[in-house]
Curated annotation (Swiss-Prot):
Gene3D superfamilies: Phosphoglycerate mutase-like (3.40.50.1240). It is an enzyme of class 5 (isomerase). The gene is gpmA2. This is 2,3-bisphosphoglycerate-dependent phosphoglycerate mutase 2. The lineage of its organism: Bacteria, Bacillati, Cyanobacteriota, Cyanophyceae, Gloeobacterales. Belongs to the phosphoglycerate mutase family. BPG-dependent PGAM subfamily. It comes from Gloeobacter violaceus (strain ATCC 29082 / PCC 7421).
Length: 219
């Protein structure tokens, strides 16, 4: 049995400014960096064998800060574009509220939340799921099958797509899924290849509790 832990990056500058980010490479805010460090402290007792992230700085920096805070800075890291955020096409860089005013709230909601809604020149969630799930099964699952704990630092829609698969969510259900900044989402990978979601932290399933230190009486 191995543990898969997925984490959305911390708050970025464009998240703070309420802009569509997509594949635009923007840095974390100071709050986002603090969120990543806090996440690392939360999951410090899970010994990771390998970590995966996207080609975008905000996810890479989040992963680095998590591993440093978890005192596991030497965990091997694999970067791949398949884990990038959903591409928002012509919406990238635009303010979300202004975009809703221009195109209509329901249209923008469909673009953002539905499975098949596709913004102009961009990807739908279904498109994102096709690339991210292909990579997940080809590269990440084999590590879990080998009994290795895996950490993934990625993006809201990438993680939403993987959750849709692992939790068997309907298109209606996935519209309601919200992925918070730096809140770990964990799944146990079972010997039969199935996944079951677990609460974090679950250090007891990874490492047995240490016995209390014995006091040494003075002679």
């Amino acid at each position: 049995m191995a543990l898969l832990v997925m984490v959305r990056h911390g708050q970025s500058i464009w998240n703070l400014e309420n802009r569509f980010t997509g594949w635009t490479d923007v840095p974390l805010t100071e709050k986002g960096r603090a969120e990543a460090r806090a996440c690392g402290e939360l999951i410090y007792c899970v010994p990771f064998a390998v970590a995966f992230t996207s080609k975008l700085t905000r996810a890479q920096d989040t992963l680095r800060l998590i591993l440093e805070a978890a005192d596991q800075p030497d965990v091997p890291v694999i970067e791949d574009q398949a884990l990038n955020e959903r591409h928002y096409g012509e919406l990238q860089g635009l303010n979300k509220a202004e975009t809703a005013a221009k195109y209509g709230e329901e249209t923008v909601r469909q673009w953002r939340r539905s499975l098949e809604g596709r913004p102009p020149g961009g990807e739908s969630l279904k498109d994102t799921a096709l690339r991210s799930l292909r990579y997940f099964y080809e590269k990440i699952v084999p590590e879990l099958e080998a009994g290795k704990n895996v950490l993934v630092s990625a993006h809201g829609n990438t993680i939403r797509a993987i959750l849709m698969e692992l939790d068997h969510l309907s298109p209606e259900q996935v519209e309601k899924v919200e992925i918070e900044y730096c809140v770990p989402v964990a799944f146990e990978h079972q010997a039969d290849g199935t996944f079951s979601q677990v609460l974090m932290p679950r250090c007891d399933i990874i490492r047995p509790p240490q016995p209390p230190a014995r006091s040494i009486a003075r002679l």
